[in-house]
C-alpha cells in the first residue's frame, strides 16, 4: 500500500515538509510505502474552467498538476499539507487542488485522505476547513486524529519539535491512515466494494 503526501509550501524543505516527513516515518513503520510530492512554486496557473481536462484527463496547463495526475492512481491514500497564509491554505495549494480534483477526481474517489496544516500562530482551523472541501466533495473517507491536524513552527523546521502535541496529533493521523488502509484492503478481500453511482443528479439553484 502507498500514501502520496502533497507539500503545498513554497519552501521545499521547510516546516510543512518536516511535518510530512514525520507522518511518513510513522507510515513507513507500519509497512506503508510513502512518497512526498512537492507542489511549492511549480504551479503555473489557476483553473480556467476551460473543460479541456474532460477530453484528455490532463490539464491544459502543463506543470506539476499533470505530474501528479500521472501518479495519483498508484496511491491508496493521500495527505494534503499546507502552510497557513492569511488564515487560508497557500495560494499554490488551492490552485493545485482546484485543477487536480477537476481533472483527476475519479482516480482518487473512495480512497482516504488526510489534511495537515502548519502555521506560526493563527488561522489554522479556517485553512483546515478550506482543505476539507476537496475530499468531502469527492466521496473520499477523511482520516481524523485526536485533535484538528495542526502543528506550529515558523521558518525553522526544527521548531516543529517544540510542538509536542502537534507532532503527536500528526502521528495519530498517520496511524489512523494506516489503520483505515488496512480496513479497506480487508474489506476488498472480503468482497466488499463501494456502491458505485452511475449518474449524479444535477440541479441548479437558479431555474
Please state what every model-predicted region is:
Residues 2-30:
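N-terminal beta1-alpha1 ligand-phosphate binding loop
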Residues 32-42:
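A short beta-strand-loop structural module common to alpha/beta enzyme folds
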Residues 42-69, 199-207:
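Cysteine-cluster motifs in flexible loop/terminal segments that predominantly coordinate metals
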Residues 51-55, 132, 161-162:
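Short, hinge-like loop/turn segments at secondary-structure boundaries
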Residues 60-147:
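Helix-loop-strand module that forms the ligand-binding subsite of alpha/beta enzymes
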Residues 141-207:
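Glycine-rich phosphate/pyrophosphate-binding loop and the adjoining helix
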